[in-house]
Amino acid sequence: MSNGTDQAQPPPENPATPVDSKSRKRATPGDDNWLPPDWRTEIRVRTSGTKAGTVDKFYYEPITGRKFRSKNEVLYYLEHGTPKKKSVKTAENGDSHSEHSEGRGSARRQTKSNKKVTEPPPKPLNFDFLNVPEKVTWTGINGSEEAWLPFIGDYKIQESVSQDWDRVFTLVTSQNAGKTMF
């Protein structure tokens, strides 16, 4: 007959079970096989400050030279064609300005930042930078207007896809203004 003490005792500890540490996962040199070709990585060790010794890994896009700090940023860029926007943290009352920042900075700068918050975010690009068509033929229509229709073989490309291509072309050419592409 049991007096109930065997149920009140905690289970014995198992010293063979490893303890999970909360340390930050470090990237290994060979884990970049998810990166597209020609992308390069750079590993830097911080040499000063409170975070001295921390290893930072940067990813560089080959055409624009844009620097990314994380795999998530690179994947977002590859999927959308634009870098991830920094999130704007708001106070509990929904006001984007904290009490600490009131009265600081020029009125012009504050007006400009308020304007940015109210503008709708740009539509993300729906363009696959890794699987571009091999050959696209552009046919001009309505000679007086500058209207062009893209074709791949005999297949006419949808207007929405053509608009996405136009936005990507504008983005890439504006980023590379003054740089030699080839």
From Swiss-Prot:
Residues 106-115 have a biased composition (Basic residues). GO terms for molecular function: enzyme binding; methyl-CpG binding. Residues 25-101 form the MBD domain. Keywords: Chromosome, DNA-binding, Nucleus, Transcription, Transcription regulation. It comes from the Eukaryota. The keyword Secreted does not apply. The lineage of its organism: Eukaryota, Viridiplantae, Streptophyta, Embryophyta, Tracheophyta. One of its GO terms (cellular component) is perinucleolar chromocenter. PANTHER family: METHYL-CPG BINDING PROTEIN, MBD (PTHR12396), METHYL-CPG-BINDING DOMAIN-CONTAINING PROTEIN 5 (PTHR12396:SF59). Its main location: nucleus. Residues 92-105 have a biased composition (Basic and acidic residues). The keyword Membrane does not apply. InterPro entries: DNA-bd_dom_sf (IPR016177), Methyl_CpG_DNA-bd (IPR001739). This is Methyl-CpG-binding domain-containing protein 5. Homodimer and heterodimer with MBD6. Interacts with DDM1 via its MBD domain. Transcriptional regulator that binds CpG islands in promoters where the DNA is methylated at position 5 of cytosine within CpG dinucleotides. In addition, binds specifically methylated m(5)CpNpN but not m(5)CpNpG (N is A, T or C). Plays probably a role in gene silencing. The gene is MBD5. The methyl-CpG-binding domain (MBD) functions both in binding to methylated DNA and in protein interactions. It is found in: Nucleus; Chromosome. Residues 1-56, 80-126 are annotated as: Disordered. Mostly expressed in flowers, and, to a lower extent, in seedlings, buds, stems and mature seeds, but barely in roots, exclusively in root meristem cells at tips (at protein level).
